[in-house]
């Protein structure tokens, strides 16, 4: 397991992140999913390569949030404060994301969000049942074969269920 110093979150994961696991992180809009995942990414990037992919925010927005996290934790907020192993990418095409993964071989992928990610060869739009299922399935196969852990951030519906196909909940490990 990859150890985490984020107590309650590490406890939920059984003490840390299992290499090759795929975890779905869901919750209401604005509750802090992206911030929590950025905090995890920043911590792990101090010991290896972490790829944080956002289809929701610009690189500048992510960096501003990272600096806010560093300030809250009493850390250095200079340019050198960002962990060297943290790679930020703004992208929604899974084909391009897979190229980035292949190029840097991260120990952890954070994808924000699975509903904004799409495969160009499928005719349906991002967030559709087919797109969400296929993107999650391909990422699961990659995680299992490479040992890369992956966190998929997922939106929820007004009823509190993960948006997209119910099969998504069965594709992930946690």
Region annotations inferred by a language model:
Residues 99-111:
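Proline-aspartate-enriched helix->loop->beta-strand connector
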Residues 133, 137-174:
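Phosphate-binding/switch region of NTP-binding enzymes
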Residues 1-69, 75, 98, 102:
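The Walker A/P-loop phosphate-binding site
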Residues 72-82:
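Intrinsically disordered, low-complexity terminal tails and inter-domain linkers enriched
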Residues 26, 82-91, 118-133, 160:
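Flexible beta-alpha connector loops of hexameric P-loop NTPases
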Residues 29-31, 56-60, 92-96, 114-117, ...:
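Conserved nucleotide-binding/hydrolysis micro-motifs of P-loop NTPases
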Residues 19-23, 112-122:
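Gly-rich Lys/Arg/Thr-decorated short loops/hinges at beta-loop-alpha junctions or inter-strand turns
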């Amino acid at each position: 397991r990859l150890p985490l110093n984020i107590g309650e979150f590490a406890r939920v994961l059984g003490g840390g992140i299992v290499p090759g696991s795929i975890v779905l992180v869901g919750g209401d809009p604005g509750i802090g999913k992206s911030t929590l995942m950025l905090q995890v990414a920043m911590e792990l990037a101090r010991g290896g390569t972490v790829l944080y992919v956002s289809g929701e925010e610009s690189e500048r927005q992510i960096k501003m949030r990272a600096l806010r996290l560093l300030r809250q934790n009493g850390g250095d907020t200079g340019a050198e404060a960002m962990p060297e192993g943290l790679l930020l990418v703004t992208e929604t095409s899974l084909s391009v994301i897979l190229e980035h993964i292949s190029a840097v071989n991260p120990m952890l992928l954070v994808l924000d969000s699975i509903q904004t990610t799409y495969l160009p060869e499928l005719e349906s739009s991002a967030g559709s049942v087919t797109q969400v299922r296929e993107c999650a399935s391909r990422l699961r196969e990659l995680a299992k074969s490479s040992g890369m852990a992956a966190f998929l951030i997922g939106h929820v519906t007004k009823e509190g269920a993960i948006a997209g196909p119910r099969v998504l909940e069965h594709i992930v490990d946690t």
